[in-house]
């Protein structure tokens, strides 16, 4: 415990430096803004902002990107409550009860419990990350190459299973992502793979080009098809203070939502969205006020908002301890770290203590900033909703082109980004979720490296994957998970749950 407090003190020393404070505030503000604006989201925003992080210290850059992620969870609740339109996917559930509360004259109370519940959950989840991170790191150090390969394979399967839509489409996206990760020159043999004679592909496909294209430009093209009509709730927001009854009813929901989010956020493919849905389903089943659900039950706002913010924090656990992304945002974080020359994984605690503990402590600082700035600035966020998308999207596209060109001063990178933007749009029209592709792209080369190491150490004996207990257990879990979801009954149940 003494060591934990010592590490946290070191982390706060890093997080409270002027540069890191400013970038944490910048990330929180950008995150809130893109959370408020429907149709953009943290994945697209982080992918668009990756180029500007190259000139920054690694700790400062990751602190800003993390602030965008959990800031979007705060901002998404504003549009969900005031417009009945989720600014972020994880806020879809908040529309069910939050907008009803607003129609009943309790918009202020809904916004307050969303912000306060998110802050409490973020604080608890930050402590969970701080306490569990070093412990899991010690466990991860005992992993061999075969264990890592099996763990990454399990992560890919879970990300496919938890993705929305057809399980076969999700698996296809994972396979495509792994294949894209293999493009370029094989570092072991020097042979070029899947380059088709294009010299620019000898170094592989650009991570920024794929992320920015699929999640940035692809989303912009898709949003241009949607009607722009947005009507903000007429009338005043009302008092921000909760009544004594609302406060009493909210506390258990916030506690349960925090627990659900802290656990589900760690799962590959889980994250904030799954946690929010899980929390809402739980509240609807166990609440004493079930009859109010659908007409403005405060539990339906408190629980999911706590859950999605807790999950946003704990999704960093597998990234920081194992180097494995739990969702698309964490895959972008892996890319940002690798671009900075840092290999995420169990050795980060010792090799990059400023980054590891500074990031953890900045999460709490960022959550405090969000609590302080969000409620007083509700009027400004509502004004932001009035910005026409016909002005917003062209500016984003120009920013994309400049950012991706500045990486290598290469026009080919711009063309590559546009190609993946069109591909991302096609994926959306075919209802093929792109997150498993990005996770596969990040994990594919890592899996290949660990596979080769395992085969070298075992002198080509594939039995090493089932002889090591950890590897065998992970492979068994992966096989059972995939086999279960291929059963028609369970697949239908999953689709029904996601639809609800």
Segments from the language model and where they lie:
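Membrane-embedded alpha-helical modules
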Residues: 112-228, 339-493
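Helix-loop-helix hairpins and the membrane-proximal interhelical loops
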Residues: 1-61, 134, 138-141, 192-297, ...
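Re-entrant/interfacial helical elements at transmembrane boundaries that shape
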Residues: 42-51, 65, 80-100, 131, ...
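Membrane-interface alpha-helices at helix entry/exit sites of multi-pass transporters
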Residues: 59-63, 100-117, 288-301, 328-331, ...
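Flexible loop linkers connecting adjacent transmembrane helices
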Residues: 48, 81-109, 135, 139, ...
């Amino acid at each position: 415990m003494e060591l934990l407090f010592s590490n946290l003190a070191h982390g706060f020393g890093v997080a409270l430096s002027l540069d890191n404070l400013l970038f944490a505030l910048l990330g929180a503000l950008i995150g809130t803004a893109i959370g408020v604006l429907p149709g953009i989201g943290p994945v697209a925003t982080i992918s668009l902002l990756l180029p500007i992080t190259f000139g920054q210290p690694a700790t400062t850059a990751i602190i800003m990107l993390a602030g965008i992620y959990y800031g979007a969870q705060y901002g998404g609740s504003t549009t969900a409550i005031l417009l009945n339109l989720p600014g972020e996917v994880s806020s879809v559930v908040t529309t069910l009860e939050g907008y009803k509360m607003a129609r009943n004259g309790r918009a202020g109370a809904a916004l307050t419990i969303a912000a306060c519940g998110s802050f409490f959950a973020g604080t608890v989840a930050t402590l969970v990350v701080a306490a569990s991170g070093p412990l899991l790191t010690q466990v991860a150090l005992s992993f061999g190459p075969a264990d890592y390969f099996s763990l990454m394979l399990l992560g890919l399967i879970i990300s496919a299973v938890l993705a929305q839509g057809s399980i076969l489409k999700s698996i296809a996206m994972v396979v495509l992502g792994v294949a894209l990760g293999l493009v370029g020159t094989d570092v072991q043999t020097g042979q070029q793979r899947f380059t088709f004679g294009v010299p620019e592909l000898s170094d592989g496909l650009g991570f920024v080009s794929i992320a920015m294209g699929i999640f940035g430009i692809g989303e912009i093209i898709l949003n241009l098809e949607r009607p722009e009509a947005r009507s903000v709730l007429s009338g005043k927001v009302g008092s921000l203070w909760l009544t004594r009854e609302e406060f009493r009813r909210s506390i258990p929901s916030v506690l349960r939502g925090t627990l659900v989010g802290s656990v589900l956020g760690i799962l590959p493919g889980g994250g904030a969205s799954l946690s929010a849905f899980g929390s809402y389903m739980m509240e609807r089943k166990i609440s004493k006020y079930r009859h109010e659900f659908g007409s403005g039950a405060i539990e339906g706002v408190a629980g999911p908002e706590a859950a999605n913010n807790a999950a946003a924090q704990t999704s960093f656990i597998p990234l920081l301890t194992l180097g494995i992304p739990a969702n698309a945002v964490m895959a972008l974080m892996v890319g940002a770290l690798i671009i900075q020359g840092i290999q995420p994984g169990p050795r980060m605690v010792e090799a990059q203590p400023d980054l590891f503990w500074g990031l953890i402590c900045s999460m709490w600082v960022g959550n405090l900033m969000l609590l302080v700035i969000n409620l007083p600035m509700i009027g400004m966020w509502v004004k932001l909703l009035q910005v026409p998308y016909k002005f917003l999207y062209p500016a984003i596209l120009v920013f994309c082109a400049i950012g991706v060109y500045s990486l290598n001063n290469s026009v080919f990178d711009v063309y590559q980004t546009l190609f993946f933007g069109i591909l991302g749009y096609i994926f959306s029209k075919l209802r093929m979720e792109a997150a498993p592709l990005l996770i596969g792209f990040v994990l594919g080369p890592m899996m290949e490296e660990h596979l080769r190491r395992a085969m070298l150490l075992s002198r080509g004996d594939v039995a090493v994957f089932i002889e090591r207990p950890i590897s065998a257990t992970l492979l068994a879990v992966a096989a059972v998970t995939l086999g279960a979801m291929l059963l028609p009954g369970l697949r239908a149940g999953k689709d029904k749950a996601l639809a609800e």
